[in-house]
Amino acid sequence: MYFCAKKPIIFKELITMSTGYNEKQAIFTERELQVTADGSHTLFVPSMDEHYHSVNGAVQESAHVFIEAGLHQLAKKEIRLLEIGFGTGLNALLTLLDTEEKEKMVTYYSFELYPLELSLVEKLNYGKLISPGQADLFIDLHRATWNEPVAITPAFTLHKMEGDSNRSTLPQNIDLVYFDAFAPDKQPEMWNPEIFKKLYECMNEGGILTTYCAKGVVRRTMKEAGFSVERIPGPPGKREMLRAVK
């Protein structure tokens, strides 16, 4: 059952991050827990004026952009998947539930520079909203140890990598990429030509990359990296999105 939006809950947390140059910088951030149009939660970062998901529906956006436009386009029974931006773990949860139902084997790699605190994760309603009988799986995704493979189920192995994908070696033989960084105008360093070249090189022939973004500059950058790129209908509230194929 969906519910009405209430006053946002504000969480403050002190995050120590690596700039990539062996320096440590303490950043004080606020993340506001908000309810989107489909009843599912998202997080809002006031300092960036940016949401983790579409306010028109977090679950609907994730399902449309990554599951329907990406995962469902693969006929393979064994899938190697790379996500740029683990975030709230919503994409991972939807992928786990979808592939378990279809008896597929998934190795799920995901980069995240700013992992969420478990105390905040436990407030998110995805598990109870999407699959109440399997709600614990969502928490299991977040409790999984970083920087090593963890079998969440016999058919779903999660390998979360804490760090910057721009400065990291990417896993190889990838079939599907979920590109879910913050928007280009908020996090431009994540949409540079080098990252798309690295992604192209790590993917198998016929591999698919999907993202919610449909900006012309992003499409051109993907094409320059070697991808065949198409604009396809976007999720509720967004006319278009991009799908790229190697």
Annotated model-derived regions:
Residues L14-I79, L97-Y126, I130:
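Rossmann-like AdoMet
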Residues E78-G87:
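Conserved class I S-adenosyl-L-methionine
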Residues G89-L93:
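Glycine-rich SAM-binding Motif I of class I
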Residues L124-S168:
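S-adenosyl-L-methionine
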Residues S168-L176:
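A short acidic, Gly/Pro-enriched loop at the edge of an enzyme's catalytic core
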Residues N192-E205:
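A short glycine-rich, Lys/Arg-flanked "PGG" loop and its adjoining helix->strand segment in the class I
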Residues G206-C213:
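Conserved beta-strand signature within the Rossmann-like core of class I S-adenosyl-L-methionine
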Residues R231-K246:
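Core SAM-dependent methyltransferase catalytic element
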